[in-house]
Swiss-Prot record:
Keywords, comma-separated and alphabetical: Cell cycle, Cell division, Chromosome partition, Cytoplasm, DNA integration, DNA recombination, DNA-binding
Domain of life: Bacteria
Activity regulation annotation text: FtsK is required for recombination.
A GO molecular function held by the record: DNA binding
Organism phylogeny: Bacteria, Bacillati, Bacillota, Bacilli, Lactobacillales
Domain Tyr recombinase: 169-354
Segments forming domain Core-binding (CB): 16-121
Recorded coiled-coil stretches: none
Protein's name according to its UniProt entry: Tyrosine recombinase XerS
Family per similarity comment: Belongs to the 'phage' integrase family. XerS subfamily.
One BP annotation, GO: cell division
Organism: Streptococcus pyogenes serotype M18 (strain MGAS8232)
Primary subcellular site in the record, as a coarse category: cytoplasm
InterPro entries documented for this protein: CB, DNA_brk_join_enz, Integrase-like_cat_sf, Integrase_catalytic, Integrase_recombinase_N, Integrase_SAM-like_N, Recomb_XerS, Tyrosine_recombinase_XerCD
KW Transferase (keyword) present: no
Length: 356
């Protein structure tokens, strides 16, 4: 969603939250957590607080009145009842036949709660320099993770990557072929944003940055002479990221039309812009996800921006066989996360089996 709309929704949630959640929000904003992450966490807290009231685990008449002692004295059994509620509640998605939330969604909810409890029991300080309370019930609640070997995950992901010549073929398809099947009205919209869309896709494929990192790019963060961009990684760390040379032409073409086409002024700092009723705005994550999905589905298979990150990582490992280099490019502090890419490009095992 647009940044302005996102901030409006955040303010709506903040208006109904207890004071300690507002403290938490302010603390995480200073790290900084992205507005998208904080918005998702606030949604999860509302879901949890609504359940506390429905389950009569608090006498508070509204969410803002739920006090700290309620959270402090919740039992493991209470939290397990909440998880059961999430698993069995009717789905609000009219396109889904499932009765409850997916395990991935449940894990996300529990992750948000764990973050809040850790803040309240370890990170925050009251007037005496102590946390608000010490009992962290979330440490007793286990999450169920999807069981899958790295080899299995790699094989599933591989089908959704644009490896080898497909990276440039995808860009070439959007540039030269996609327009041919559009109506005249659709062509007009496509042509307006063509350079920008190609620049975004090229940057994701050439750098492997996260979607949030691309969204938050400002003009000052992009150095096309050096082909380096400055991003804010998870945890608020600033990082310099190298960008593959094939993206340069696409980025330059976008910059050549950015000011005129999106009516950008000096105060419009965002690198990737959208324009609505003559007003330029930072392009948001949801719009980029939809854009990438639209083009990729027409080319081969619908993918997310994160799969473009996987594509870059896999191609880089295939070229260098260096997990350290790949982990640095992706902004990971450990090579453990990059084990996946060794499985995606590891054809030696298959070749050995073929020779049996």
């Amino acid at each position: 969603m647009r940044r302005e709309l996102l901030l409006e929704k955040i303010e709506t949630y903040k208006a109904i939250m207890p004071w300690y959640v507002l403290d938490y929000y302010q603390s995480k904003l200073a790290i900084p957590y992205s507005f998208t992450t904080l918005y998702e966490y606030l949604k999860e807290y509302k879901r949890f607080f609504d359940w506390l009231m429905d389950a009569d685990l608090t006498q508070a008449p509204k969410i803002a009145d739920i006090d700290l002692s309620t959270l402090e004295h919740l039992t493991k059994k209470d939290l397990e009842a909440f998880v059961l509620y999430l698993r069995e509640r009717p789905s609000l998605n009219t396109y889904s036949t499932k009765e409850g939330l997916s395990q991935t969604t449940i894990n996300r909810t529990l992750s948000a709660l764990s973050s809040l409890y850790k803040y309240l029991t370890e990170e925050v300080e009251n007037d005496q320099g102590e946390p608000y309370f010490y009992r962290n019930v979330m440490k007793k609640v286990s999450t169920k993770k999807k069981k899958e070997t790295l080899a299995s995950r790699a094989e599933n992901i591989k089908q959704k990557l644009f490896l080898g010549d497909e990276t440039l073929a995808f860009l070439d398809y959007v540039d030269k072929e996609y327009e041919q099947k559009l109506s005249n009205r659709a062509k007009s919209s496509f042509r307006k944003n063509k350079e920008r869309d190609l620049a975004i896709i090229a940057l994701l494929l050439a750098s492997g940055v996260r979607l949030s990192e691309a969204v938050n790019l400002d003009l000052k963060d992009v150095n096309l002479n050096m082909m380096i961009i400055e991003v804010i990684r998870k945890g608020g760390k600033r990082d310099s990221v190298n960008v593959a040379g094939f993206a340069k032409g696409y980025l330059e073409s976008y910059l050549a039309v950015r000011q005129r086409r999106y009516k950008a002024e000096k105060q419009d700092l965002a690198f990737f812009l959208t324009e609505y009723r003559g007003v330029p705005n930072r392009m948001d994550a949801s719009s980029i996800e939809k854009m990438v999905g639209k083009y990729s589905e027409d080319f081969k298979i619908r993918v997310t921006p994160h799969k473009l990150r996987h594509t870059l990582a896999t191609r880089l490992y295939d070229a260098t066989k260096s997990q350290v280099l790949v982990s640095h490019q992706l902004g990971h502090s450990s090579t453990q996360v990059t084990d996946l890419y060794t499985h995606i490009v590891n054809d030696e095992q298959k070749n050995a089996l073929d020779n049996l």
